[in-house]
């Protein structure tokens, strides 16, 4: 799914990455919230795939830093997650249980999805008396 959002002009370059840690209070009061931070999820990482051109100087200014804002197309980055299942098939869809994060650090709790699509198996590791897979997964929610 294509997501168009706003980012400051100095950061707007194709291939650039950023992570939304937390949405600042000032953003909730901004008239551009719905097309800027409102389209992004805290804790998730994004990659800029396209910078949309503006024919005129941007009328959009960020309330936090005063920078000129430009529209960009972003793609959500995949997450590295532990999955504790008897077997994993790349391309399969599974539920994610945050209790699996005991042996491997996970993204922040608000970034954890309830369902994921397994993109790639990275490793198999032992945790206590059991095993889990470390996978690259695409969040489905």
Swiss-Prot record:
Alphabetized Pfam families for the sequence: UPF0179
InterPro entries the UniProt entry points to: UPF0179 (IPR005369)
Secretion signal, residue range per the UniProt entry: none
Family membership: Belongs to the UPF0179 family.
Record protein name field: UPF0179 protein Cmaq_1008
Higher taxonomy: Archaea, Thermoproteota, Thermoprotei, Thermoproteales, Thermoproteaceae
